Each structure stands twice: as structure tokens, then as C-alpha cells.
A protein has these predicted regions:
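Anion-binding and metal-coordination hotspots
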Residues: 1-217
Length: 217
């Protein structure tokens, strides 16, 4: 459930604001689960300097996973496999650098099949400016793969499940966007806006209280 909020000036860069909020919250025993785009050497260093645990998704073109790994079609390249919602999830865990970080790489075959199907369908319908052939899908070796950088030495399935919990955060954003009035966000005074933000936080607490009650019934 939401435990902290802070009003920041709109001129502050998102990534800078994030670290300011982490510092102000006094958060210690927690795990930072970010979204794609947050990972960078600067942000990674800031989190490690603050002593924070983290799970940071990497971009599809990340250099933290060697291209040969994607090109290798032998599934023995993985450390193992587990199931999630009746889907096979292949995984590999690899140490990164000398500061205790790991790169966790997963492949979801169900997701891979969806992406391949979408690719072939677009080719058949002649989407895009460049001429392509359906068999070009074989060149897209990274389909279905996703990777995380984390400083937690855990079984890959635990990392995967921890990241999946971010859905609760997405629900929070959806609630704020779709269920809470945004008219007050254009208030002309700081006091009015801060009051609106406080009521939003209280509203979220009640919302999550209801969600948790329904989950436990």
C-alpha cells in the first residue's frame, strides 16, 4: 500500500526527483523496482551509494547481455526453467562487475510466440516502409527475452516474481488517472495543490484497503 508521497516542483528532472524522494522518505529496508528507461550508470551508482536494493529492467538493446547469447538456439545456455501462470520461463543469472550486481535474463516462450506472430502478420499486410519477408522473423533473436540488473543475490524466480508485483503500482497510477479528479492539479496556489495531493494519498489508502480486503475474502 502507499506509505509516502511528496509534492515536487515540475521543473525537477524525474530521475533527480526520485532520488530526492527516496532520501526524504527515510526508506532503508525496501527494494526499488523501476521501469524501463531508469537504468543508467549514474542512477545505478546513486542507488548503490544510498545502500538501496533494486531491480532495474534493461532495454532490449542492452550491452549487458552478449549478442551471442540471443543467437544461441540451444536452450542448455540457460541455468534452468520455472513456470509462471502455466508458462515456461527460462532464466540465466550472471555476475556483473565487481560490486555485487547480477544480470538476470529471462525468456518467455509464450510472449515470444505472440511477438513473432505480430511480426509475421505485419509483414503479410505490408506494414512498414522497408520490404521484408516473413522468414525475417528469425533475425529478431531478442523476441521474448527481458533482463534485469539487481544487487540482490536471489534465485531468478524470486527476482521475476518481485518485478511482477509492480502491477500493484500500475494499478495505483491507473486509479489516479481514471478515478481521481485532476482539475485541482491546475490550482494557482501551492497550498491548494498540496491539499489536493494529500487527499489523493488518503484516497489511495482507502482504495488499497478495499483491494486488500477483496483479495483476502
Amino acid at each position: 500500500k502507499p506509505v509516502f508521497y511528496r509534492v515536487l516542483q515540475g521543473s525537477i528532472v524525474d530521475k533527480t526527483a526520485f532520488m530526492d524522494v527516496v532520501t526524504a522518505s527515510g526508506c532503508r529496508e525496501c527494494v526499488i523496482i523501476a521501469d524501463k528507461g531508469f537504468y543508467s550508470k549514474h542512477n545505478l551508482s546513486a542507488l548503490m551509494s544510498a545502500g538501496m536494493k533494486f531491480i532495474l529492467p534493461l532495454r532490449e538493446d542492452t550491452v549487458n547481455v552478449e549478442p551471442e547469447f540471443y543467437e544461441n538456439t540451444d536452450d542448455h545456455k540457460f541455468d534452468g526453467v520455472f513456470t509462471y501462470n502455466k508458462r515456461a520461463i527460462w532464466y540465466r543469472k550472471k555476475a556483473s562487475g565487481n560490486r555485487g550486481n547480477f544480470i538476470y535474463t529471462f525468456r518467455d516462450d509464450h510472449r515470444k510466440a505472440e511477438l513473432q506472430g505480430n511480426y509475421v502478420e505485419k509483414v503479410e499486410k505490408h506494414y512498414g516502409e522497408q520490404p521484408r519477408h516473413p522468414m525475417d522473423v528469425l533475425k529478431e533473436t531478442r523476441m521474448g527475452y527481458f533482463s534485469f540488473c539487481s544487487n540482490m543475490d536471489k534465485h531468478p524466480k524470486e527476482i521475476y516474481l518481485d518485478y511482477k508485483e509492480r502491477w500493484d503500482i500500475e494499478q495505483c497510477f491507473d486509479y489516479l488517472k481514471n478515478s481521481v479528479s485532476t482539475s485541482a492539479s491546475h490550482a494557482h496556489t501551492d497550498e491548494y495543490f498540496r491539499g489536493w495531493a494529500f487527499l489523493n494519498h488518503i484516497s489511495l489508502l482507502y482504495y488499497y484497503g478495499l483491494i486488500n480486503a477483496l483479495r483476502n475474502t
